[in-house]
Amino acid sequence: MYIHELNPIAFSLFKLKIYWYSLSYLFGFIFSYFYVKFILNKDFVNISFKIFEDFLGWAVIGVVIGGRIGYVIFYNLNFYLDNPIEILKIWQGGMSFHGGLIGVILSIFFFSKLKKIDFLNLLNLVSSCAPIGLFLGRLANFVNKELIGRPTNSDWGVLFFENDVLRHPSQIYEAIFEGLIIFIVILYIIKKKYYTSINVSSLFLIMYGFFRFTIEFYREPDSHLGFIFMNISMGQLLCLPMVLLGLMFVKKKNVGY
């Protein structure tokens, strides 16, 4: 058993509270920056590092705006329609991965058109470092005591709140499978140059969708939504088109190979 006593505030700077949740995004982009520099030396995609640097700002906008709008629309629309100012309070949590994914894909689409580069190449590059952000983001969710798991009697159960039951650390499950494992698999494909026959972005969609769908069975559904039907949550529903889309294009190789 683990008693959760972590503080969501990392530190304060001149009365400004810096949250672990915000830092997870910051370090996600920083680590991705250096990781992309590494994998581009493996001839992974026909894109220069300068192009990726130019895209970073677009990626930040896509993730933040898409993630927030996705959460508002998919998970708590009525609340935010009644309290629109709350939409701006991103530091309190409330981001949707699926919304962030759509936001980033749109950013990639418009950026690739502007720079006249191949959309799929940039999508594969971004997909290769997405697990880094997922890993850090899920750890931040754990610190924030959000997206908590369902009750469990296991030895690794977590007591998130006083007078509550032990719960699955579903955020840690997601950090391991959606973050660490997908990262290792994609890195292996890049190092072995299997990307000439396997589309990395499609593989990411399939693996993430499968892991997220499975782990949702150990995670409490959003209290204001509950299950959409039977024991299926909104997150699981949103994973289905991801997997189907990934299966459609998994054999489409990178341009130039």
Describe each region flagged by the PLM.
Residues 1-257:
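A feature for loop-to-transmembrane-helix boundaries and adjacent hydrophobic helices
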